[in-house]
Amino acid sequence: MRILLIAVLFLLMPKSNAEIPGCDFFDTVDISKAPRFSNGSYLYEGLLIPAHLTAEYDYKLLADDSKEKVASHVRGCACHLRPCIRFCCPQYQKMQKSKCYGDMSEDELNKHDPFVNVTLSDGSVVRRHFKEDLIVQSDLAKPGCPRMYFLNHELPGNEFTLFENGSLLRHWDKVELSKREYCVQHLSFKDDSIRIAPHFCPLSSEHSRTWKTVAIVISLICIILTISVYLYVEKLRNLHGKCFICYLASLFLGYFFLVLNVWKYSSGFCVTAGFLGYFSVMAAFFWLSVIGIHLRIKFSLASNCLHRLLPENPFRAYNLYAWGIPLIMTAITYTADQVVKNEKLRPRVGVGKNCWIYTGDMTVMIYFYGPMLLLIAFNIIMFVLSAIYIYNIKKNVKGLVHKQQTNQQINDQQMFAIFLRLFILMGLSWSFEILSFLLTKQQAWARALMVADYFNWSQGTIIFVLFILKPSILKLIIAGGRQNLPGSHHNSRSKAARYNSTHTACEGSIADPNAYC
């Protein structure tokens, strides 16, 4: 309730400075010195920018989406009206060894080639003068690296395509760079020519992206294999197993949309993919909480009273909870994205060519990381309560040799161990993800938390190893999915007697589907 109240108060607060709705900072230019008309419009480089595409800014956005405080100035969304070209330095300066030098001499201007090829949205290629036909952006922050590489399109393997929307495609590795990731500048070449050449950071980020993709794809394959085993092995298709499958399905969808975003394959339906990815990740957390809730219920009550707390069809109730609440959260996030006027409080799904919820500032804590932290805290409570129960049971039955009590203790411990594994796996990995977000501007911490990122991307692989590559599960797979798990060799008469004594069906657990109720 407090978080909701704080969010409402934030929405009601007046904006400290306006931003242009629907316009990325990297699509704007500084128009402070341009003539202003009485209707609020500006005339910039022969382009009339209407009042609704202008706003006052008191910051400069850096390549990593962090903000640097600067003097208040007016910016216009010129790139929505005419194609822009993003320069590294002032427009008439040259660049050598990643540094900007003074303006070109008259002789250099005479031999300089001022034209660039621009690919339009219909696929046609036109030749444009950088100054006369395009809007020059020269006040944006350079890509965040001390040394940049450049492309000489006259050399084999150095071809590139500059698109009308400002993005640049490197042909040799098919990577499309946004205006945050590259800039162009006049450059002297060995043949004594001066041409406009794109500059970009070393490819470590691309290598990281490749390894990220490898880790996620392997996880996706392992999730499919894990789901297949749980569907194939009859003994695993109990209530816990079904909840586990739903958890894996939502985790699969979350990773699927994440890898699409990494390689920009979802750009055609960017906003839709962002909301679907958001829903999937939230659903995975709620299904993890379902497992914790159900185990807590089993630990809290005697088995003959279990049916009094659970609804007649608990799996249906769990589905309503674990899919329904994330759906409501997604609807709220979508509504906020449409109606909230303060740009700093909008989720901004799909902003900056990133087909995910915007993570460039603390707003993500309201819509994404905040709910995630609450669910992690809830699961910690479930874990502590279950641990206390296990401890008390172990203490109470110490010295007893009654077989059913001993087996009950073993089964409870097995179920708790499963929940503990899942909690540590997902809770810890996403906790590191949130920590990584909070410390993203501190390079030393960012490097240290890189291993946590790979741990997060490899969740599906770890689940497969922990839950499938076990002797008991492998034995069931080899036996055709019908053999009882080890430790379940009780005759049918004793099982029937136990069933009648408890008056309720035994759901079993992920670890041991034949566990006592």
From Swiss-Prot:
Signal peptide: 1-18
Transmembrane residue ranges: 213-233, 243-263, 273-293, 320-340, 364-384, 415-435, 460-480
Record keywords: Cell membrane, Disulfide bond, G-protein coupled receptor, Glycoprotein, Membrane, Receptor, Signal, Transducer, Transmembrane, Transmembrane helix
GO molecular function, one term: G protein-coupled peptide receptor activity
GO biological process: cell surface receptor signaling pathway; determination of adult lifespan; G protein-coupled receptor signaling pathway; response to starvation
Residues linked to a glycan: N39, N117, N165, N456
Cytoplasmic topology ranges: 234-242, 294-319, 385-414, 481-517
Membrane association type: Multi-pass membrane protein
Location relative to the cell: Cell membrane
Topology, Extracellular side: 19-212, 264-272, 341-363, 436-459
Disulphide bond pairs: C23-C77, C79-C84, C88-C183, C89-C100, C145-C201
GO CC, alphabetical: membrane; plasma membrane
Family: Belongs to the G-protein coupled receptor 2 family. Mth subfamily.
Entry protein name: Probable G-protein coupled receptor Mth-like 4
Organism, scientific name: Drosophila melanogaster (Fruit fly)
